[in-house]
Swiss-Prot record:
UniProt-annotated binding residues for Mg(2+): 85, 127-128, 450
Reactions that this protein is recorded to catalyse: (2R)-2,3-dihydroxy-3-methylbutanoate = 3-methyl-2-oxobutanoate + H2O; (2R,3R)-2,3-dihydroxy-3-methylpentanoate = (S)-3-methyl-2-oxopentanoate + H2O
Gene that this polypeptide is encoded by: ilvD
Gene Ontology MF: a single term: 2 iron, 2 sulfur cluster binding
This protein's name: Dihydroxy-acid dehydratase
Superkingdom, natural source: Bacteria
Location of N6-carboxylysine modifications: 128
């Protein structure tokens, strides 16, 4: 590939007499005379031993590196960070999770631009790796491909499949006296059997599936198990495809368009994906300069059915979906019914129609993961945008898989996740209550923690169908039940959620997509006059910088919005 038909960015480093010192440094890392005309490709390697999500990524990076060399490129491997949501969940450390999305994006952008690289292959596993990498790709706009680290296989105990969410729910079950300490320990020991990202259609698998649908990852790659050989082969194949994309000068913004983002959102709805996808795709669209709002998610939700019976509210995990035909099977069904844009370009240079040409029109009848079109799990999508006087800018809810999609009840108000969790575990929350967790938003937390511990405790206590929960924080992809997150404006900036008092009646009406506080405008005005913002929880360091810069969740919680206005 030494004779690329397009000018290489790396020539500012590799060509000319003045760059002799630059070349001297490159020779030290393995460049030879004949290598200075080859494309330099960065491999953003999120390998880490702190989480099973990322502990198998080094093998994928090595396979991709070798394949890039064979394809005539010069790979340069660099590290980027990860936070384990599952390990930090319920702790102060979870405040860094969403922050890490920005750190990942900024770090990849910094290295690729700082070293004048010609292409990027990013490999990630845990939740924020995916959007962080894609935000960077959209900003950089050099030929890029994303390689997912792969999903974990399910654990097994007492005749049932387990995921990490099983362990969170077991805590609630134990606290409610529904299981013994021995059973709790058994679930803990069996929930995570090896490498790979959390196994249901939680955030990591949702985002990887969406990237495949968008055309930035290879077909079938998003549902492969991390420990299977086909995942390593997929990393090598991704490298080969990227080398060809560099030749053809196919760039992320050729792929990340309004149409392809609509395709991704349609697939997210069809597979029953995570609420976090809303936040992340708002941020990805912002990075790619593609107009996208919360209302667009609601428009797509209304026309796309849920086709896949996947955890957290369903029965199966991502490896089951892979055996049933994977994301291409879901996409083919959507395409056949006019719910995908088939003319979108993918990183391989093919269109969506071309990629899906040989995929069957309907799923195999000998599986139950993907429902036939005439018999969907739900006739409309599950991620609803709720609005009302409690969320004028909007809020995000999962509205399928709940027995009671409407609830009106007294507010139980908590100004932190920890105080709420303690109340649940000590039996203070009753059927019919509407739990409010506030000051957990992007600025207020800061960091918009995921409320998996409280929601799992509610489920474990047997209250999942009778208790509502709203928050200006987020939810894990493993959350289900009558839960509403991303309430905006958040409490810290004076949103209505800051004015809720203990015992106020709140209505969550999922079918009507309403979130209403039953307090008069006059009383709210009196409360607002008395309200003042709390002192920032952090005044120095990463969280302080984040809180100062971050936007509303309704805009994706981005940190580079209107910086110079």
């Amino acid at each position: 590939m030494a004779n690329s038909p397009f000018p290489l960015r790396s020539q500012v480093v590799t060509q000319g007499v003045q760059r002799s010192p630059n070349r001297a440094m490159l020779r030290a890392v393995g460049f030879r005379d004949e290598d200075f005309g080859k494309p330099i490709v960065g491999i953003a390697n999120a390998h880490s031993t702190l989480t099973p999500c990322n502990m198998g990524i080094q093998t994928l990076a090595e396979r991709a590196e070798a394949a890039l060399r064979t394809a005539g490129c010069m790979p340069q491997v660099f590290g980027t960070i990860t936070i384990s949501d599952g390990i930090s969940m319920g702790t102060e450390g979870m405040k860094y999770s969403l922050v890490s999305r920005e750190v990942i994006a900024d770090s990849i952008e910094t290295v690729v631009n700082g070293q004048s690289m010609d292409g990027l292959l990013a490999i990630g596993g845990c939740d924020k790796n995916m959007p962080g990498a894609m935000i960077a790709m959209a900003r950089l706009n050099v030929p890029s491909i994303f390689v997912y680290g792969g999903t974990i296989k399910p654990g097994h105990y007492n005749g049932r499949d387990l995921t990490i969410v099983s362990a969170f729910e077991a805590v609630g079950e134990f606290s409610a006296g529904r299981i013994s300490e021995e059973e709790l320990l058994a679930v803990e020991r069996h929930a995570c059997p090896g490498a790979g990202s959390c196994g249901g259609m939680y955030t990591a698998n949702t985002m990887s599936s969406a990237f495949e649908a968008m055309g930035m990852s290879l077909p079938y790659s998003s549902t492969m198990a991390a420990e299977d050989e086909e995942k390593a082969e997929s990393a090598a194949q991704s490298a080969k495809v990227l080398a060809e994309a560099i030749k053809a000068n196919i760039r992320p913004r050729d792929i990340i368009t309004r149409k392809s983002i609509e395709n991704a959102i349609s697939v997210i709805m069809a597979v029953g994906g995570s609420t976090n996808a809303v936040l992340h795709f708002l941020a990805i669209a912002h990075a790619a300069e593609v107009p996208l709002t919360l209302d667009d998610f609601e428009t797509i939700r209304a026309r796309v059915p849920v086709l896949c019976d996947l955890k957290p509210s369903g029965r199966f995990v991502a490896t089951d979906l892979h055996r049933a035909g994977g994301i291409p099977q879901v996409m083919k069904m959507l395409l056949n019914h006019g719910l995908l844009h088939g003319d979108c370009l993918t990183i391989s240079g093919q269109t969506i129609v071309e990629v899906l040409r040989d995929v069957p029109d309907e799923p195999s009848p000998d599986q139950e993961v993907i429902r036939p079109w005439h018999s969907p799990l739900y006739p409309q999508g599950h991620l609803a945008i709720l609005k009302g006087n409690l969320a004028p800018e909007g809020a995000v809810a999962k509205i399928t898989g709940v027995k009671n999609p409407q609830i009106t009840g007294p507010a139980r108000v908590f100004d932190s996740e920890e105080s709420c969790l303690q109340a649940i575990l000590s039996g203070q929350i009753r059927a019919g209550d509407v739990v409010v967790i506030r000051y957990e938003g992007p600025k207020g937390g800061p960091g918009m923690r995921e409320m998996l511990s409280p929601t799992s405790a509610i489920i474990g206590a047997g209250l999942g169908d009778s208790v509502g929960l709203i928050t200006d924080g987020r939810f894990s992809g493993g959350t289900y039940g009558m839960v509403v997150g991303h309430v905006a404006p958040e409490a810290y900036v004076g949103g209505t959620i800051a004015l809720v008092e203990e015992g106020d009646l709140i209505t969550i009406d999922a079918p009507a997509r309403q979130l209403h506080l039953h307090v008069s405008e006059e009383e709210l005005a009196r409360r607002r006059a008395r309200w003042s913002p709390p002192e920032p929880r952090y005044k120095r360091g990463t969280l302080a910088k984040y809180a100062k810069l971050v936007s509303s969740s309704s805009l994706g919680a981005v940190t580079d919005l209107n910086l110079w206005d």
